[in-house]
Regions:
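Class I S-adenosyl-L-methionine-dependent methyltransferase catalytic core
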Residues: 1-149
């Protein structure tokens, strides 16, 4: 990886429960290999898992091993308290365009359309952990973002 990683225990120990509102939504990105752990993290942070959302990416070659080419990433949607959604979304999967960085895709970069979806479904305030860029109306935290703007 071209960025530092954390263990499951380190992620579960993050003080998210202490900074999230008592009524809040959580959108937790994961990949197929770590779906079970995502549920554990959500619960450790005081959230109740509700459903798994899927980003179905257009394939780009065969990638690394296994019987199936990994062309999906997932977002575990979880709730804490009774925060109502702003609208009901008619799908749990999307084929968003892959974000590009320079001459090609950047590993782990998430599509802007995802944040637009969050803004349409979940009331603020909004916090993004491990952010790569600032976004108006969001508080961001991450070692790749310059400052919260």
């Amino acid at each position: 990886m071209d960025y530092p990683t954390m263990t499951l225990a380190e992620i579960e120990a993050m003080p998210v429960a202490g900074v999230a509102d008592k009524d809040a939504h959580l959108y937790l990105w994961t990949i197929n290999r770590y779906v079970e752990q995502a549920y554990s993290v959500a619960r450790a942070w005081g959230f109740r898992p509700v459903c798994l959302l899927t980003w179905a990416k257009t394939p780009r070659g065969l990638g690394l091993g296994g019987a199936f080419v990994q062309t999906t990433e997932h977002i575990l949607f979880a709730r804490r308290g009774t925060l109502k959604a702003l609208r009901r979304e008619p799908s749990t999967w999307w084929n968003w365009t892959r974000p590009e960085a320079g001459t090609g895709p950047k590993h782990s970069r998430k599509p802007e359309d995802f944040q637009t979806l969050v803004e349409a479904v979940s009331p603020g305030p909004r916090l993004e952990l491990f952010a790569r860029r600032a976004r108006p109306g969001w508080t961001v935290w991450g070692n790749e973002v310059e400052a919260n703007k």
